[in-house]
Design a protein with these regions (language model features):
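Short, charged/polar, low-complexity loop and linker segments
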Residues: 1-5, 64-70, 111
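Amphipathic alpha-helical interface elements
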Residues: 1-61, 79-86, 90-94, 99, ...
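Generic alpha-helix initiation/capping and coil-helix boundary signal
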Residues: 70-71, 126
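Short secondary-structure subsegments characteristic of cysteine-rich extracellular domains
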Residues: 102-117
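Short Fe-S-cluster ligation motifs
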Residues: 122
Length: 145
């Protein structure tokens, strides 16, 4: 038995927001002067959300960027992508379960100290975190078009 359509739509919306945040970062990179070749979109596009976040924050990369505002934007982009990756992974690595009589995803990863229902409240909070990240990066944008 599947979860209700409204719940499944929220899962889809969360997935879309993750992709939107990733592209908000990747799409700006070609328009930021002075970036090293390792930050080429072709090199980064296949990375997971978490790996992309780690790459953008790496000292090796940041040391190659002269502009302080660009360094800050890259670092913060990486941090926000890593936070988003945790939410993304909580959904994608969850399993269907019946909780309080409703079908929903249940994140069960005891070694990672992640055991919880991916319920409406959790989805709302995760969506809000990602929306806030998108807004923050938009305000701090360093790309020139």
């Amino acid at each position: 038995m599947l979860a209700e359509d409204s719940y499944l739509i929220r899962i889809g919306r969360l997935s879309y927001l993750v992709a939107y945040l990733e592209w908000a970062v990747l799409g700006d990179l070609p328009h930021i002067p002075g970036l090293p070749p390792d930050l080429g979109v072709r090199k980064l596009a296949g990375m997971t959300t978490g790996r992309l976040g780690q790459t953008l924050q790496s000292k090796k990369i940041l040391q190659q960027v002269a502009d302080v505002d660009t360094q800050d934007w890259l670092r913060r982009s990486g941090e926000l992508l890593e936070i988003t990756a945790r939410d993304r992974n909580s959904v994608l690595h969850a399993r269907p379960a019946t909780v309080d009589g409703k079908q929903m995803l249940y994140r069960w990863h005891p070694e990672g100290n992640q055991v919880f229902a991916v319920d409406e409240a959790w989805l709302e909070a995760a969506e809000q975190r990602i929306r806030d990240a998108i807004r923050e990066l938009s305000v701090r944008r360093v790309a020139t078009f």
